[in-house]
Regions:
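Conserved PLP-dependent catalytic core of the aminotransferase class-I/II
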Residues: 43, 50-115
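Conserved core segment of the aminotransferase class I/II
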Residues: 3, 7, 11-60
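PLP-dependent enzyme catalytic core of the Aspartate aminotransferase-like
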Residues: 111-114, 123-165
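Short hydrophobic/aromatic beta-strand micro-patches
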Residues: 19, 93-95, 134-136
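Structural motif
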Residues: 1, 17, 114-116
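Short beta-strand/turn micro-motifs at beta-sheet edges
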Residues: 36-41, 81, 118-123
Length: 165
C-alpha cells in the first residue's frame, strides 16, 4: 500500500492518493473512516492537479528550480549556524526546540516580510519546536537571500545563533 498527498507537490491544492491491489482499495472504500467521512475533491482541483502532472511529464524545469532553491536556502542557513533537519523536502524545518521562541521568531520574521510558521507541541513532539519554511520554485535567489538575511538578523537578536554579524 502506497499513500501520498497532492497538497504541497501540486501548488498547495488538496487531495491525495492510495495505491494497492484492487481488493485492498475496495476494502478501504468500505471501511476507511477518512474516505467515508470526507467529500470528493472539487472538479477544478482535480483538473488543476491533472494539468500539473501533464506539465511535469513534459519538463522538469520547475522541479529542478525548486531543488536548487531548497539546497541554496539550506546551505545558507547551515552556514549561518542554524540547526536544520536534513531531507529532500522543500519544507525546511529550522529547529529551535522551544515553543515560545518559535512563535517569537515567526512574529519577528513577519515584521521583516518573511512569512513562516512556528510549530510546537502537539503538532510536533515536545521540545522539538521549529520554524517551518516552505520553499517554492517561484522564489528567486534575491528572495532566498532576503529570507536568509532576515533569519540571521532575528537569530542574532534572539540569541539563537552566535556567528559573526
Amino acid at each position: 500500500i502506497v499513500t501520498g498527498t497532492l497538497g504541497k507537490a501540486l501548488g498547495g491544492a488538496m487531495g491525495g492518493y492510495t495505491t494497492a491491489k484492487k481488493e485492498v482499495i475496495e476494502l478501504l472504500r468500505q471501511r476507511s473512516r477518512p474516505y467515508l467521512f470526507s467529500n470528493s475533491l472539487a472538479p477544478a482541483i482535480v483538473g488543476a492537479s491533472l494539468k500539473v502532472f501533464e506539465l511535469l511529464k513534459k519538463d522538469t524545469k520547475l522541479r529542478d528550480q525548486l531543488e536548487w532553491n531548497t539546497n541554496y536556502f539550506k546551505k545558507g542557513m547551515l552556514e549561518a549556524g542554524f540547526d536544520i533537519i536534513d531531507g529532500d523536502s522543500a519544507i525546511v524545518p529550522v529547529m529551535l526546540y522551544d515553543a515560545q521562541l518559535s512563535q517569537t521568531m515567526a512574529d519577528a520574521l513577519l515584521e521583516k516580510g518573511i512569512y513562516v510558521i512556528g510549530f510546537f507541541f502537539p503538532v510536533v513532539p515536545k521540545d522539538k519546536a521549529r520554524i517551518r519554511v516552505q520553499l517554492s520554485a517561484a522564489h528567486t535567489k534575491e528572495h532566498l537571500d532576503k529570507a536568509i538575511s532576515a533569519f540571521i538578523e532575528v537569530g542574532h537578536d534572539l540569541n539563537i545563533i552566535k556567528t559573526a554579524k
